[in-house]
């Protein structure tokens, strides 16, 4: 059965440590490689929920279930891992579905390709009960494509909240430095006049 095969593969990959490594997702991501199907609402929801921050997106269109899905996902990860694209992170997204429809994301070759990615991988694969093995092998995972967009936006949102405070601290520091320099000039000027 699919459930038994899922459990056996999970055990095997867990023993190998495939699910342990979690690389940090870069702050303020700018260039995103996306692997998904161009058809359906998933890619639309994902891009709609990315903040308007000028992300550069390189997209690989592939089937995400059925015939050709495994090969397409592997091809997408390998293609987008090439340094010539200059990407910060890979995103693998699809909507939810049954255990049967998620088989490409429970495929050993797909899981190992994700684990072997040069770039950090975020998996945004909708699921209810059985978390796809691809999500476990990814460096970060969100339960939906929309939640994946929120995860990517988070560091930019934190930065935009922090910038005004940093600006105030910098202005205060500059004012303090200027007061100190002004005082030193006054002391030196007074010293020169009295010499």
Located regions from the model:
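Short, acidic/small-residue loops that bind anionic groups at enzyme active sites
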Residues: 58, 109-128, 132-133, 145-151
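Residue-level detector of flexible, active-site-proximal loop/helix-junction positions
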Residues: 64-66, 121, 128-129, 140
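Charged, elongated alpha-helical interaction scaffolds
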Residues: 128-195
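Phosphate-interaction motifs
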Residues: 1
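Phosphate-binding glycine-rich loops and their immediate beta-loop-alpha structural context
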Residues: 4-101, 106-117
């Amino acid at each position: 059965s699919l459930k038994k095969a899922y459990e056996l593969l999970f055990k095997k990959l867990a023993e190998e440590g495939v699910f342990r490594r979690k690389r940090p997702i870069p702050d303020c991501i700018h260039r995103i490689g996306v692997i998904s199907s161009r058809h359906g609402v998933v890619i639309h929801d994902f891009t709609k929920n990315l903040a308007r921050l000028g992300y550069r997106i390189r997209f690989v269109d592939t089937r995400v279930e059925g015939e050709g899905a495994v090969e397409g996902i592997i091809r997408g990860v390998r293609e987008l891992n090439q340094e010539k694209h200059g990407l910060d992170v890979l995103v693998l997204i699809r909507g939810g579905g049954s255990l049967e429809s998620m088989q490409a994301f429970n495929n050993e070759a797909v899981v190992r390709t994700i684990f072997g990615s040069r770039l950090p991988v975020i998996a945004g694969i909708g699921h209810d009960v059985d978390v796809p093995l691809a999500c476990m092998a990814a460096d970060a995972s969100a339960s939906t494509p929309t939640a994946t967009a929120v995860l990517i936006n988070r560091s930019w949102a934190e930065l935009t909240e922090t910038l005004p405070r940093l600006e105030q601290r910098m202005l205060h520091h500059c004012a303090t430095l200027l007061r100190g320099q002004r005082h030193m000039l006054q002391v030196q000027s007074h010293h020169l006049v009295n010499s």
